[in-house]
Swiss-Prot record:
The organism of origin for this protein: Meyerozyma guilliermondii (strain ATCC 6260 / CBS 566 / DSM 6381 / JCM 1539 / NBRC 10279 / NRRL Y-324)
Catalytic activity, EC: 2.7.7.6
Record note on quaternary structure: Component of the RNA polymerase II (Pol II) complex consisting of 12 subunits.
UniProt-recorded Gene Ontology molecular function terms: DNA binding; DNA-directed RNA polymerase activity; ribonucleoside binding; zinc ion binding
Reactions catalysed according to its record: RNA(n) + a ribonucleoside 5'-triphosphate = RNA(n+1) + diphosphate
Major localisation: nucleus
Family (UniProt): Belongs to the RNA polymerase beta chain family.
The protein's role, per its UniProt record: DNA-dependent RNA polymerase catalyzes the transcription of DNA into RNA using the four ribonucleoside triphosphates as substrates. Second largest component of RNA polymerase II which synthesizes mRNA precursors and many functional non-coding RNAs. Proposed to contribute to the polymerase catalytic activity and forms the polymerase active center together with the largest subunit. Pol II is the central component of the basal RNA polymerase II transcription machinery. It is composed of mobile elements that move relative to each other.
Highest taxon in the source lineage: Eukaryota
Keyword tags: DNA-directed RNA polymerase, Magnesium, Metal-binding, Nucleotidyltransferase, Nucleus, Transcription, Transferase, Zinc, Zinc-finger
Protein name: DNA-directed RNA polymerase II subunit RPB2
Organism classification: Eukaryota, Fungi, Dikarya, Ascomycota, Saccharomycotina
Zinc finger region(s), C4-type: 1172-1194
Length: 1236
């Protein structure tokens, strides 16, 4: 750094303060290192690298005891068979072909051949046989001696199954490849990974939101319930089984009714009744009343709380020994067993099931008692109204389960199943005295198929229990536009019933700030339940808590067992992951130490450290699934000379910038080089810090570095006021800066940039801070339907459907966040010249007029690809179906379309023009000789047609044909068809502000209005679209785009910057235009000046995927349903248009009976029935050729009537008959009087 001249980024020395530009440099370094899907990749890597191994070791020993058989003299030994699981091995993804060869697999091949991108998993298994002598007698434990096994190898590597691999994770083939290698592998360098390829389709795991385990929460209960307050905790072990045992402590009696009998009871797992709290304490070995009270109430002078505890102590007065208390609990758990057993049962429950997160070992009763007391204390504080009840929707008390935990829970179930199978095999072998083969014992299909099934269907759980499992966890990755893909990978889901109209969980909560996007959520039933992560938020993968406990013990934490509340009334309680581990007398010092350890990197940066001064609590969380985000640290050390400034200095910015150009390396404390200076170097230098929602509430955050400067510079309040007045006179539209009174200048952190609170879809909106909030939400949904280039390798991909815009442009008004969303490289829209005017009236109600000449020149044209797929089904080695060109002579049931375009191999050649219902893949199935094919079959027909026709509503050109084999070695074909879609009347377009509209009419160039310079707009939208929607940003975008097209620079439309409409107007004026963007226009037909000036300029428009050609539908006659003989439903099946209940009601109200009859019967399912005039049933046998009619049961051949009723009515009558109800139809002429 000494050689300043060579440094390309040297600033003036006086500008030592951090500018917004510097903040963007830091943000750049964040995205360079992390990317946008790091939360998916990190979580999956954690699963592969450590979780699988832990799950395998969780129940790593299978033990089978075989008692002595005593069949012969020698055979008096007990045998014990033992199988142990050891290390696991996983490699890069491979594919085993049908002929048994194995080769490495790349994602593109998996996509094209419909394979699963997965890696084989192996595990070391060891078997031992131990024996013991039976003659030793049964007084003491049997001694197990290793039985000598001749040359048995110590451990065998056994194949467990295949695990799907997430793309771009550490085990993926594409990790850390260069640009050129991507090209050779036909992968797009912009593809960010984070998804799986299962059977050729790309699947994302959506993050699932849940409440955090191991935290105590107190809630109020509503009036009718006898319980007024309840404290609950859902316990889960930190590592290993997700078995959650929950426990509640309930405060009975409502304060209105009575004050005397407000008892407190606990709900214990596996115990049917609620147990009075005092009895639980006594069962835990805390017997005297005084000790119990001391565990609950930490202040002996707090008479209110002691008064609340009086009824509880009285209730438990009858039981005064530990044994009796245990027996009391045991009686209510296990029925009909002896007293000793009951006591042991109660002991086991208290040890293993009560608060298992503290420990499941014995001898920790005091810890559990203190924690129980803490829960009761929290409950009473809430009941005494000294503390608010907890907020269920607080985001800090939520966790997101990503790929790692989700796959872990699945793998655990499957692995348990596998070990059970191994155990059963072992038992069978021992019983039948067979040789035990490890490789045969393991059913590798269990894990392979189980994982694949869940990822393919989204039903998370076992296949057999598909009903109980969660649905929609895994979804097909949305590949419409690049931003829709990104957004899908950062989506979170809250599994609450969608139908319940509960508002609370759906609302935006204060704690969501910076962690989830405030704008991007769907409309309708999932609103607020499906969220998207903000740009810089990450999710913790979880770190072990042991090192932290070790640190705490080093730094003077007193263990909980030694805690005596009366001796140290002011000490602070220390919690780690919700477990109370001890107390500390100097919390401030401890917190500072822990923070500095975290900033130095001795503790993982994702650990959150929370000190609640008021409640005298110090909480540390290290668990997985916490959402956190980075912030700049403000130096608040009173001794430091940079007090009140950012820890981030100019030198850090220089290092970051230089790392891009020179080989500037970060050095760690040992002076070793660690690669270029980047984001992680900033974290290690203690300049930025990760903060989660819970910790965020204990710190003070400045919005921008400027605010920090303002609070630091000690202007008096009056000086600030006068400064503000001056500013206000300059520009009324300027942002109002918060005035910092000198009391609140205790900032500890600073936002990196406020625009980072937005998610992927909302970051594309220019000036979102100038729009009404729902408009941003609408655009966030619509931006995902815009056409663009979804990936650069679209020409080699065979997606089911793909839309590519001919000529996508980057927007003239950009946001800084777009650089990191690759929106410049892969845009989704075009800059259209837009006039906001009424012209001819064809742009009313959100329609717009489009310039036909622009369309002819290629404006908003797009390509559409659709892929058809088929394969030859096989049974074992013989093929059931064959690709061929079916011939009329020997094939049954040929389709309507033409078979002429097929080649002899049954496939169509690329470049051929096809239209609706043409056959593009010819395929036949052999007919077994003995089947009767509904009377159509003759002896010539040996095959049935199974061809694939083109969709009836589409036409185009065959683009690409891929013939290959799938994983089972069956022949397999994909045919891609392409069409050009030209904008026409009825197609849907939208600007980036939720201003959507359809094309109302297209005028040629000469019919459009023009400006004095002869510029003609591409679009004319209606001015009525603006005022009620308040999308001011739409107008500012137009102004800014106009300026940037004149100046040749990109306009910066990022949110929360100092750009004002006034500033943009000034620039526009300097370029010689009217400052507010109005222009004089001339009528296209007459050439006269228009009466009003027209707001005119370029605006970025998106072509959306709803096109009129894909929706147009009409039908006269066509296919009908088999059962009701009414027209089928849906455009794809050429269905009818439903005349529904509401339409029927309108016709009844209108009184148009003839029309009603025609719609509901004649045009639908009219049917002729013959009815017997005697019995009124449809039992007539009619011979229409001979004109003979007869009702056999009535012996009636003359009194018969022909009526017309809807077929559905006939069906109803027959169904009633089947239920033993006889509907009799009498006509006017049958003369039967129906009594009224």
């Amino acid at each position: 750094m000494s050689d300043q001249a060579s440094d390309p980024y040297m600033y003036d020395d006086d500008s030592s303060s951090i500018t917004p530009e510097d903040c963007w440099t830091v943000i750049s370094s964040f995205f360079q290192e992390k990317g946008l899907v790091s939360q998916q990749l990190d979580s999956f890597d954690e699963f592969i690298e450590s979780t699988i191994q832990e799950l395998v070791w969780e129940d790593s020993r299978l033990i089978l005891d075989q008692p002595a058989q005593h069949t012969s003299e020698e055979d008096h030994e007990n045998r014990r068979y033992e199988i142990t699981f050891g290390k696991i091995y996983i490699s890069k993804p491979t594919q085993t072909e049908g002929d048994g060869t194995t080769h490495p697999m790349f994602p593109q091949e998996a996509r094209l051949r419909n394979l699963t991108y997965s890696s084989p998993l192996y595990v070391d298994m060891t078997k031992r046989v131990l024996k013991s002598d039976d003659n030793a007698g049964n007084e003491h434990e049997l001694e197990w001696i290793e039985e000598e096994i001749k040359d048995e190898e110590p451990s065998t590597k056994v194949y467990l199954g295949k695990v799907p691999i997430m793309l771009r994770s550490k085990f993926c083939m594409l990790r850390d490849l260069g640009e050129h290698e991507f090209y050779e592998l036909k992968e797009c360098p912009y593809d960010m990974g984070g998804y799986f390829v299962i059977n050729g389709s790309e699947k994302v795991l959506i993050a699932q939101e849940r409440s955090a385990a191991n935290i105590v929460q107190v809630f109020k209960k509503a009036a009718p319930s006898p319980i007024s307050h309840v404290a609950e905790i859902r316990s889960a072990l930190e590592r290993g089984s997700r078995l959650i045992s929950s426990m509640q402590i309930k405060l009975y009696g409502r304060e209105e009714k009575s004050t005397s009998n407000r008892t407190i009871k606990a709900t214990l797992p596996y115990i049917k009744e609620d147990i009075p709290i005092v009895i639980v304490f006594r069962a835990l070995g805390i017997v005297p009343d005084g000790d119990i009270l001391e565990h609950i109430c930490y202040d002996a002078n707090d008479w209110q709380m002691l008064e609340m505890l009086k009824p509880c102590v009285e209730e438990g007065f009858v039981i005064q020994e530990r044994e009796v208390a245990l027996d009391f609990i045991g009686r209510r758990g296990a029925l009909g067993i002896k007293r000793e057993k009951r006591i042991q049962y109660a002991k086991d429950i208290l040890q293993k099931e009560l608060l298992p997160n503290i420990t499941q070992d014995e001898g920790f009763e005091t810890r559990k008692a203190f924690f129980l007391g803490y829960m009761v204390n929290r409950l009473l504080l809430c009941a005494l109204e000294r503390k608010e009840p907890d907020d269920r929707d607080h985001f800090g008390k939520k966790r997101l389960d990503l790929a790692g935990p989700l796959l872990a829970s699945l793998f655990r179930i499957l692995f348990k199943k596998l070990t059970k199978d191994i155990y059963n095999y072992m038992q069978r072998c021992v019983e039948n005295d067979k040789v035990f083969n490890l490789t045969l014992a393991v059913k590798s299909q269990t894990i392979t198929d189980g994982l694949r099934y869940s990822l393919a269907t989204g039903n998370w759980g076992e296949q057999k229990k598909a009903m109980s499992s969660r649905a929609g966890v895994s979804q097909v990755l949305n590949r419409y536009t690049y931003s829709s893909t990104l957004s899908h990978l950062r989506r979170t889901n809250t599994p609450i019933g969608r139908d319940g109209k509960i508002a609370k969980p759906r609302q935006l909560h204060n704690t969501h700030w910076g962690l989830v996007c405030p704008a991007e959520t769907p409309e309708g039933q999932a609103c607020g339940l499906v969220k998207n992560l903000s740009l810089m938020s990450c999710i913790s993968v979880g770190t072990p808590s042991e090192p932290i406990l070790y640190f705490l013990e080093e730094w003077g934490m007193e263990p909980l067992e030694d805690y005596v509340p009366s001796n140290s009334p002011d000490s602070t309680r220390v919690f780690v992951n919700g477990v109370w581990v001890g107390t500390h007398r100097e919390p401030a010092h401890l917190v500072d130490t822990m923070r500095s350890l975290r900033r130095r990197g001795d503790i993982s940066p994702e650990v959150s450290i929370i000190r609640d001064i008021r409640e005298k609590e110090f909480k540390i969380f290290t668990d997985a699934g916490r959402v956190y985000r980075p912030l700049f640290i403000v130096d608040d050390d009173p001794e430091s000379e940079t007090k009140g400034e950012l820890k981030l200095q100019k030198e850090h910015i220089h290092k970051l910038l230089n790392a891009e150009y020179s080989e500037e390396y970060a050095t760690n404390e040992f002076g070793e080089e660690e690669g270029p200076y980047g984001w992680s170097s900033l974290v290690n230098d203690g300049v930025v810090e990760y903060v989660d929602a819970e910790e965020e509430e204990t710190i003070m955050i400045a919005m921008t570095p400027e605010d920090l400067e303002a609070s630091k510079s000690s202007l008096t309040a009056t000086q600030q006021k006068s400064l503000q007045l001056e500013e206000q006179e300059l520009d009324p539209a300027k942002r109002i800066k918060p005035t910092n009174s000198s009391t609140t200048s205790t900032f500890t952190h600073c936002e990196i940039h406020p625009s980072m609170i937005l998610g992927v879809a909302a970051s594309i909106i220019p000036f979102p801070d100038h729009n009404q909030s729902p408009r941003n939400t609408y655009q966030s949904a619509m931006g995902k339907q815009a056409m663009g280039v979804f990936l650069t390798n679209y020409s080699v991909r065979m997606d089911t459907m793909a839309n590519i815009l001919y000529y996508p442009q980057k927007p003239l008004a950009t946001t800084r966040a777009m650089e990191h969303l690759k929106f410049r490289e892969l845009p989704a829209g075009q800059n259209a010249i837009v006039a906001i005017a009424c012209y001819s009236g064809y742009n009313q109600e959100d329609s717009m007029i489009m310039n036909q000449s622009s369309i002819d020149r290629g404006l908003f044209r797009s390509l559409f690809f659709r892929t058809y797929m088929d394969l030859e089904k096989r049974q074992g080695m013989k093929a059931l179906e064959t690709f061929e060109k079916p011939s009329r002579s020997d094939t049954l049931r040929l389709k309507h379309g033409t078979y002429e375009k097929l080649d002899d191999d049954g496939l169509i050649a690329p470049g051929i023009r096809v239209s609706g219902e043409d056959i593009i893949i010819g395929k036949t199935t052999p007919i077994p000789p003995d089947t009767e094919e509904l009377g159509q079959r003759t002896q010539y027909h040996t095959k049935r047609d199974a061809s694939t026709p083109l969709r009836s509503t589409e036409s185009g050109i065959v683009d690409q044909v891929l013939l290959t084999t799938n994983g089972d070695g069956a022949k397999f074909v994909k045919v891609r068809m392409r069409t050009t879609k030209v904008p026409q009347i009825g197609d849907k377009f939208a600007s980036r502000h939720g201003q959507k509209g359809t094309v109302g009419v297209t005028y040629r160039h000469e019919d459009m209005p023009f400006t004095s310079q002869g510029i003609v707009p591409d679009l004319i939208i209606n001015p009525h679209a603006i005022p009620s929607r308040m999308t001011v940003a739409h107008l500012i975008e137009c102004l800014l785009s106009k300026v940037s097209s004149l100046s040749g620079l990109e306009g910066d439309a990022s949110p929360f910057t100092d750009v004002t409409a006034e500033a943009v107007s000034k620039l526009l004026r300097e370029h010689g235009y009217q400052s507010r963007g109005f222009e004089v226009m001339y009528h296209g037909h007459t050439g006269k000046k228009l009466m009003a000036q027209v707001f005119f300029g370029p605006t970025y428009y998106q072509r959306l995927r709803h096109m009129v050609d894909d929706k147009i539908h009409a039908r006269a006659r066509g296919p009908v349903q088999v059962l009701t003989r009414q027209p089928v439903e849906g455009r794809s099946r050429d269905g009818g248009l439903r005349f529904g209940e509401m339409e029927r009601d309108c016709m009844i109200a209108h009184g148009a009976a003839g029309f009603l009859k025609e719609r509901l019967m004649e045009a639908s399912d009219a049917f002729r029935v013959h009815v017997c005039g005697v019995c009124g049933l449809m039992s007539v046998i009619a011979n229409l050729k001979k004109n003979q009619f007869e009702c056999r049961s009535c012996k009636n051949k003359t009194n018969i009537y022909q009526i017309h009723i809807p077929y559905a009515a006939k069906l109803l009558f027959q169904e009633l008959m089947a239920m033993n109800i006889s509907p009799r139809l009498y006509t006017e002429r049958s003369g039967v009087s129906v009594r009224t």
